[in-house]
Amino acid sequence: MISAEEALKRLRKGNKRFVSDSSIFNKISHKSRRHPLTEDQDPFAIILGCSDSRAPSEIIFDQGLGDLFVIRVAGNIVAPSQIGSIEFAVERF
């Protein structure tokens, strides 16, 4: 597990890559990441974001498969189900 500070640093660096159109994940194959993810997941950050199809967290933060645990919700209203998902991720990862 990495610190919250390190996770935020990785997200900010990824967002800078996204904004500057210099993604590292659109240039590499996710194939090498798929097999390990069939066994387990180990995301470094939990993201609560908008359901808007124009705002996928993995792309905006330039992260690969399994790097983020993403909960998406419409209307900026967090219901018990989203809170439960966040609690699950905090306890699990």
Where are these regions (language model features)?
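Short HxH-centered metal-ligating active-site micro-motif
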Residues: 4, 59-93
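Long, non-catalytic terminal segments
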Residues: 1-38
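Divalent metal-coordination and catalytic microenvironments
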Residues: 11, 47, 71
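Fold-independent oxyanion-binding glycine-rich loops
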Residues: 14-15, 21, 50-52, 73-74
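Conserved active-site and cofactor/substrate-binding residues in soluble primary-metabolism enzymes
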Residues: 2, 6, 42, 55, ...
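N-terminal short beta-loop-beta anion/metal-coordinating cradle
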Residues: 26-66
